[in-house]
Amino acid sequence: MQKMPSQILNDGSSVSLNSASMNMANTPNSITVKTAYNGQIIITTINKNISYEELCYEIRNICRFPLDQPFTIKWVDEENDPCTISTKMELDEAIRLYEMNFDSQLVIHVFPNVPQAPGLSCDGEDRSIYRRGARRWRKLYRVNGHIFQAKRFNRRAFCAYCQDRIWGLGRQGFKCIQCKLLVHKKCHKLVQKHCTDQPEPLVKERAEESSDPIPVPLPPLPYEAMSGGAEACETHDHAHIVAPPPPEDPLEPGTQRQYSLNDFELIRVIGRGSYAKVLMVELRRTRRIYAMKVIKKALVTDDEDIDWVQTEKHVFETASNHPFLVGLHSCFQTPSRLFFVIEFVRGGDLMYHMQRQRRLPEEHARFYAAEISLALNFLHEKGIIYRDLKLDNVLLDHEGHIKLTDYGMCKEGIRPGDTTSTFCGTPNYIAPEILRGEDYGFSVDWWALGVLLYEMLAGRSPFDLAGASENPDQNTEDYLFQVILEKTIRIPRSLSVRAASVLKGFLNKNPADRLGCHRESAFMDIVSHPFFKNMDWELLERKQVTPPFKPRLDSDRDLANFPPEFTGEAVQLTPDDDHVIDNIDQSEFEGFEYVNPLLMSLEDCV
């Protein structure tokens, strides 16, 4: 099989297509194809017996190439290498390997040119695009000529196929970018009508439904009743909460207090990421200290970025009032920014403390690993994969207990047995199954905990190799991934037998055999592991086990545990740019506002 570019110059002759070869529903003979072109991914299905000419015809239609446009087709093999398809033989080989490897889809890349000579790359071809997750692609779905894009509809919308309302968390609807047809995500493959490239009339609302309220998800119940606040009945998913005492300044009936930037005093910058700035702020009315995550809307106008913000908000709401997860106070927005007001955890993160201590005593690492395990298990029980466990995201509160933060990488809606496939995470913590391109579930969080526990106990990453820093070829992300996949992890001899055992359990490259991943026993395997033998898990969950380390803090505003490169920054927000605001679709952020009712009750009683 040839793995170098070769020329594909279609002569534009008409091809008589078997209708069963294209845009077919999922059948035993169908193959899902992801075609990457011009920053977009178009998803369609083909018959596995498709001819090379039929494939070229389909690609020409998908990419809207004129008849005289030459182009190059490359499929990506199991090693993420590009292989040119220029003949029926090469197409058959791609399909054969697709079936042999039990792949879920055939990934191809299209370039609107041909190489200048055999062995050269196409114009615009970069090897990095073949690594899963290396760049963001706009994902489209092609069915009967429709080019569907997943959308979240903030206003009332109805499916053109089943006539039912489109609603729910995330992007539940698909919209054709050509004819504007609206359908459910679940219905898009069933659409029989071909796209006309002309806008379709909207499905009219039925008169008898016009006054129906749009279903709204109920706010999550608290993890446990807060002291001095509401008392919960028997703990279960639908426990009733007794109303708290009336606030000192009661609101008008039917209204809910909303917050704005004017309600807060901005004090210091305490963190910064690629999307957001984090500030320490004071709520003027109560003088309570919070952290405020500030995100510029102009940076999240892409659909997938907007989903990331919505996911983080949903997980913040779910996590509120859990002892080991950072909770949400409120959300609000301005024309240019989104604001998350969250708990201020002032003890610093584990990365900050590890840089000063290098390694931790085993009893310290055991305590932190146990509290992290409880937090991860709670998320898993709620159908959430965390996917970004690392030292930076483990905070210490003023007493020394941990709290996980930063939920932007989370995946929601995972039921037992469900999997996902997105390539994401921090490179040093990415699990082997993600690197292999396999579908995965909660197993990736337990792998990351193994990496983090190794770092706490050994003072270094399990994937650090002697002499690697002196060799530029071994300082690349690809080399790190190769080490994670192939190298045997060496446990320091200085660690106890129990510590070595738990590390080997978490760092098993086979997720089916990994500690915490057995379908029946799952979390109980962690609880009963000898490394945690003396841990009282019930007391731990109630925060009644004394932490091994208590951060030194002079006040609730003490920033001694935060890096000075952040705290020394100017705290002011940059002025709004009217031109930038004019280009923001504000409808994408409708309904972002939120107030945590339990925290509100606590504040009102102050």
From Swiss-Prot:
<protein>
    <recommendedName>
        <fullName>Atypical protein kinase C</fullName>
        <ecNumber>2.7.11.13</ecNumber>
    </recommendedName>
</protein>
<dbReference type="GO" id="GO:0045176">
    <property type="term" value="P:apical protein localization"/>
</dbReference>
<keyword id="KW-0963">Cytoplasm</keyword>
<keyword id="KW-0067">ATP-binding</keyword>
<dbReference type="GO" id="GO:0106310">
    <property type="term" value="F:protein serine kinase activity"/>
</dbReference>
<dbReference type="GO" id="GO:0016327">
    <property type="term" value="C:apicolateral plasma membrane"/>
</dbReference>
<dbReference type="GO" id="GO:0030010">
    <property type="term" value="P:establishment of cell polarity"/>
</dbReference>
<dbReference type="GO" id="GO:0045198">
    <property type="term" value="P:establishment of epithelial cell apical/basal polarity"/>
</dbReference>
<dbReference type="InterPro" id="IPR017892">
    <property type="entry name" value="Pkinase_C"/>
</dbReference>
<comment type="subunit">
    <text>Interacts with baz; the interaction is required for apical localization of aPKC in neuroblasts and epithelial cells. Interacts with Dap160; the interaction promotes aPKC apical localization and kinase activity. Interacts with and phosphorylates l(2)gl and yrt. Interacts with crb and ref(2)P. Forms a complex with baz, fz and Patj.</text>
</comment>
<dbReference type="GO" id="GO:0055059">
    <property type="term" value="P:asymmetric neuroblast division"/>
</dbReference>
<keyword id="KW-0547">Nucleotide-binding</keyword>
<dbReference type="GO" id="GO:0007416">
    <property type="term" value="P:synapse assembly"/>
</dbReference>
<feature type="domain" description="PB1">
    <location>
        <begin position="30"/>
        <end position="113"/>
    </location>
</feature>
<keyword id="KW-0597">Phosphoprotein</keyword>
<dbReference type="GO" id="GO:0030165">
    <property type="term" value="F:PDZ domain binding"/>
</dbReference>
<dbReference type="GO" id="GO:0045186">
    <property type="term" value="P:zonula adherens assembly"/>
</dbReference>
<dbReference type="InterPro" id="IPR011009">
    <property type="entry name" value="Kinase-like_dom_sf"/>
</dbReference>
<dbReference type="GO" id="GO:0045880">
    <property type="term" value="P:positive regulation of smoothened signaling pathway"/>
</dbReference>
<dbReference type="InterPro" id="IPR053793">
    <property type="entry name" value="PB1-like"/>
</dbReference>
<dbReference type="GO" id="GO:0045196">
    <property type="term" value="P:establishment or maintenance of neuroblast polarity"/>
</dbReference>
<dbReference type="GO" id="GO:0010592">
    <property type="term" value="P:positive regulation of lamellipodium assembly"/>
</dbReference>
<dbReference type="GO" id="GO:1904580">
    <property type="term" value="P:regulation of intracellular mRNA localization"/>
</dbReference>
<dbReference type="GO" id="GO:0000132">
    <property type="term" value="P:establishment of mitotic spindle orientation"/>
</dbReference>
<dbReference type="GO" id="GO:0072659">
    <property type="term" value="P:protein localization to plasma membrane"/>
</dbReference>
<feature type="binding site">
    <location>
        <begin position="270"/>
        <end position="278"/>
    </location>
    <ligand>
        <name>ATP</name>
    </ligand>
</feature>
<dbReference type="GO" id="GO:0140591">
    <property type="term" value="P:nuclear envelope budding"/>
</dbReference>
<dbReference type="GO" id="GO:0004674">
    <property type="term" value="F:protein serine/threonine kinase activity"/>
</dbReference>
<dbReference type="InterPro" id="IPR046349">
    <property type="entry name" value="C1-like_sf"/>
</dbReference>
<dbReference type="GO" id="GO:0035003">
    <property type="term" value="C:subapical complex"/>
</dbReference>
<dbReference type="GO" id="GO:0001738">
    <property type="term" value="P:morphogenesis of a polarized epithelium"/>
</dbReference>
<dbReference type="GO" id="GO:0035331">
    <property type="term" value="P:negative regulation of hippo signaling"/>
</dbReference>
<dbReference type="Pfam" id="PF00564">
    <property type="entry name" value="PB1"/>
</dbReference>
<dbReference type="GO" id="GO:0002052">
    <property type="term" value="P:positive regulation of neuroblast proliferation"/>
</dbReference>
<comment type="similarity">
    <text>Belongs to the protein kinase superfamily. AGC Ser/Thr protein kinase family. PKC subfamily.</text>
</comment>
<dbReference type="GO" id="GO:0005524">
    <property type="term" value="F:ATP binding"/>
</dbReference>
<dbReference type="Pfam" id="PF00433">
    <property type="entry name" value="Pkinase_C"/>
</dbReference>
<dbReference type="InterPro" id="IPR020454">
    <property type="entry name" value="DAG/PE-bd"/>
</dbReference>
<dbReference type="InterPro" id="IPR002219">
    <property type="entry name" value="PE/DAG-bd"/>
</dbReference>
<dbReference type="GO" id="GO:0120157">
    <property type="term" value="C:PAR polarity complex"/>
</dbReference>
<dbReference type="GO" id="GO:0035556">
    <property type="term" value="P:intracellular signal transduction"/>
</dbReference>
<dbReference type="GO" id="GO:0007283">
    <property type="term" value="P:spermatogenesis"/>
</dbReference>
